[in-house]
């Protein structure tokens, strides 16, 4: 039950990441923001979190603060709830969305450590927790269209409901240990610290690969709806279908990738995912119809998330003594890097076209594919790498 509650909060937390992207077309249509301006809102959701995420990871490693996931969830919800209310002021929107981004950043390290504690560290079990996030992102566009369609941008206030309701459920289920200190990095079940060194070089290469993933994810989330509107002159409601399909396909990719990683090897899955994602991005750029955009977006979501769980577990194997920091970088900092690039992508979209943005994304994914060949597998049983302590039967426990 604890893992189900935690997974539900992951869905709620990442719902607010999806809500940012879903709100962008309405800021363009109702508040007359430029593409560069809405890309700046994406930056707001990620800029401060790019600094805060490793700090939250360090705090999780050092102090095991379980309550930080709940506090982060509530902050994420509050920021998005306020964003539509203050839409007349770009600075105010930027500020409240930044608060939401910090909340999302605070959630991930603590929640990932708890999920690992509950369900172990295999790619398969990790993928299940990650799917909670995919589900939340997928539900966000429909929820945003519903509340904004009925009440205008001020209807964003209703978007705080998932954080309050699911946060309350989690607090009740986890009340006995919510404010207790988690065992940092679960070293009790591992080998002595001296025998499990951190491999910072490998982790740096993984971070470089993830940076290309981040730009692809944020770029697609920011521009896929706007692309359909610009190229095919469809309404915001129809355009949002692709935005829902993207994370829904990502959920399929996450589960499939986790299963394949445990059977075929993580690096094979990582490389296959980047290659598929690059091809799908080119298909989006040259799609002849809105339906073709949706189909290509589904392929992109699947390919982009095939490596997701593998990348998380690789980060844990590279930094076995700093699980919180590894999670913070894998799930947060790399995503934030995409947000930092988003204003540049928005400027390109204003000056050229959104099609140009997707061609750039395709090139970056090919760069990620090439960089993935530098990565090394750290297999359980190595004298330097402890086997993750996993309870494989717990399939429901456990991002981006």
Question: Where do the PLM segments sit?
Answer:
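Residue-level signature of mid-helix packing/kink "hotspots" within the transmembrane helices
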Residues: 18, 46-54, 138, 247-255, ...
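Extracytoplasmic gate region of multi-pass secondary transporters
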Residues: 20-21, 202-251
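Helix-to-loop junctions at the C-terminal end of transmembrane segments
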Residues: 52-64, 253-265, 349-350
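Cytoplasmic helix-loop-helix junction between adjacent transmembrane helices
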Residues: 96-132
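Helix-loop-helix hairpin linking two adjacent transmembrane segments in secondary transporters
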Residues: 129-176
């Amino acid at each position: 039950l604890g893992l189900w509650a935690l997974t539900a909060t992951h869905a709620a937390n990442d719902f607010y990441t999806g809500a940012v992207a879903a709100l962008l077309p309405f800021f363009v249509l109702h508040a007359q923001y430029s593409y560069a301006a809405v890309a700046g809102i994406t930056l707001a959701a990620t800029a401060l979190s790019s600094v805060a995420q490793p700090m939250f990871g360090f705090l999780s490693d050092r102090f095991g603060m379980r309550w930080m996931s709940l506090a982060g969830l509530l902050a994420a919800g509050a920021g998005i709830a306020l964003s539509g209310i203050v839409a007349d002021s770009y600075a105010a929107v930027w500020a409240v969305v930044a608060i939401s981004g910090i909340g999302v950043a605070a959630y991930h390290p603590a929640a990932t450590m708890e999920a690992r504690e509950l369900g172990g560290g295999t790619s398969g079990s990790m993928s299940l927790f990650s799917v909670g996030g995919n589900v939340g992102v997928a539900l966000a566009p429909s929820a945003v269209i519903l509340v904004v369609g009925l009440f205008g941008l001020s209807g964003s206030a209703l978007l705080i409901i998932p954080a309050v309701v699911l946060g309350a459920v989690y607090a009740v289920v986890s009340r006995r240990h919510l404010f207790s200190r988690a065992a940092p990095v679960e070293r009790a079940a591992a080998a002595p610290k001296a025998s499990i060194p951190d491999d910072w070089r490998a982790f740096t290469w993984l971070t470089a690969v993830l940076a290309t993933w981040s730009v692809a994810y944020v770029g697609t989330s920011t521009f896929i709806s706007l692309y359909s509107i610009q190229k095919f002159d469809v309404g915001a409601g129809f355009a949002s279908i692709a935005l829902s399909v993207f994370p829904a396909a990502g959920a399929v990719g996450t589960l499939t990738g986790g299963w394949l990683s445990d059977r075929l090897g993580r690096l094979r899955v990582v490389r296959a995912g980047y290659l598929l994602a690059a091809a799908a991005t080119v298909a989006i750029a040259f799609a002849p119809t809105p339906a073709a955009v949706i189909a290509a977006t589904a392929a992109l979501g699947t390919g982009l998330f095939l490596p997701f769980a593998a990348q998380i577990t690789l980060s844990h194997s590279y930094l076995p003594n700093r699980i919180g920091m590894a999670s913070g970088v894998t799930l947060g900092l790399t995503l934030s890097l995409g947000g930092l690039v988003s204003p540049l992508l928005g400027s390109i979209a204003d000056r050229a076209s959104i099609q140009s943005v997707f061609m750039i994304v395709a090139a970056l994914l090919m760069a990620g594919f090439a960089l993935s060949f530098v990565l090394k597998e750290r297999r359980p049983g190595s004298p330097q790498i402890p086997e993750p302590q996993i309870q494989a039967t717990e399939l429901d426990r456990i991002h981006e």
